[in-house]
Every structure is written in C-alpha cells, then in structure tokens.
Amino acid sequence: MAAGGRQRRRGRFVGLAVALVAATACMVEPVGRPGEPTGQREPAAPSAEVTRADGTDTVEEFQEDVEVARRTAERYWAAQFEASGTTLRPIRQVIAYQRDGEVSCGGQEVPRNNAVYCTVSDFIAYDINWSFGAFRQVGDAFVYYLIGHEYAHGIQTRLGVQYNFTIQQELQADCMAGAYLGGAVEAGWLTLDEGDLDEFREGLLAVGDDPGQPWFAEGSHGTPEQRAEAFFRGYERSLSACGLG
C-alpha cells in the first residue's frame, strides 16, 4: 500500500497479525474525569532489535506511513462530514509511547502492546515498539488498518454512536476502517499493490475472539469471520454499509 503511487514492497499480513492486530481494536472508555494525556507527544524511537524477514522497512518508512494513514483518514472523514453539511473536528493527537503508564486516559493507564482511542481526551495512542515490530513483520497494511480502526472510534464518538455491546461498536469500526481504505483507494489517495486485498483478508481471518468467548462479553470484538466480513463490507460497499444512518 502506498500514498499517491509511492511503490512499496508488500509485507505479509499474517503471523503477528494474530497476536497484534487483534489488540488494536480497542477503544478506551476510561473511568474518572477527563484530563490531558500524559506521555510523549513526538514519536519515540522504536527499538532496533526487531527485524523483518526481507529487512526492507525502516523507522522512517514506518513513521511516514503512520502520518500518511492519519492524514488520509482525516481527509476521508472530512469529506464525509462535508457531504453531510457539517465540518469534521479532527482527532486532536496521535501519540507514540513505549512503557506501561507512559500515557493515561482519564486516569486509566494505557498498557504496552496496544493501540487505543481515548474518548475523554480525543487522542489515539499506540505502543511504537509493538507497532513497529508488526509493521516490519506484517507489512504497511497493518499501519493503515490500525489508524483506520482507531480513527473510526473517534468518529463514533463525534456522532454519538452507542451500542449495548462492545462487539457492535468494534465490528462497526472494522466496517468503517474498510470504508475509509476503500474510499481512499477509489479517490486515488492510496494505491494497492497486487495481492494486498488477499493479505487483508488472510490477516483479518487470523484475528478475532477466542472460540469460547461469549459474543455479549465486555471487550468482545467478533469472530475472525465476522471481522473480515465487516471490514470488506465497508471496503466494497462504502460507508452506507456500516449502519451509521
């Protein structure tokens, strides 16, 4: 995946996707009064210990993809809001962190090996070492999915979307992430390399809740099949398929 035709070597959207992408689909609903995020505002330097099989992707490429994914998500949602006669208030901040407790959301510490959207302070936070490791072993598709899913949670908050069960919120965010990526590709803001969609599908089928987890349990995100179906429903049929209206 690339911005404006920038060609990139494709990474496999498998392997770490099982352990890593599943954890990205989290929206912090913190306890306590709203507060400013604590922690680093500028991206920290990721560990150099993580290596990718082909050794092609660098810290600079990772940081560039994070920024392109953020700008593209903002551009996509601004266009959707404008088409509805209103103006998007962009998500205030995207924060990289490295340690447990380095970032907090409404008094709740954000753990390592995670990515979240904080509703009370309006920011996305991601563990940079964990994310960079996934980027190098899974590929840049991981970054665009991660940012797309968490940005979708920010849009849900702006629209006042609320559900009785976590799984409903999460599957809708998967659909919205698919709509954002599909819309960005259709508009020419992003380009897909051959096989990227197959990698998205394989990766999404590799994530999901454990077979024994009840669908109604707090924190449920959906089965692998449900998550893949939601993402590609949004990708193929656009935002109208995501149940926002």
Language model segments and positions:
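Catalytic zinc-binding patch centered on the HExxH motif and its immediate surroundings
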Residues: 99-125
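Active-site metal-coordination segments of metallo-dependent hydrolases
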Residues: 56, 60-63, 161-175
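Short pre-active-site segment immediately N-terminal to the catalytic Zn-binding motif
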Residues: 128-145, 161-167
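Catalytic Zn2+-binding segment of zinc metalloproteases
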Residues: 151-167, 180-185
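Short helix/loop segments within enzyme catalytic domains
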Residues: 67-70, 80-82, 178-210
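Pan-zinc metallopeptidase signature
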Residues: 212-245
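A metal-dependent hydrolase signature that marks the N-terminal structural subdomain at the beginning
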Residues: 2-4, 14-15, 22, 26-105, ...
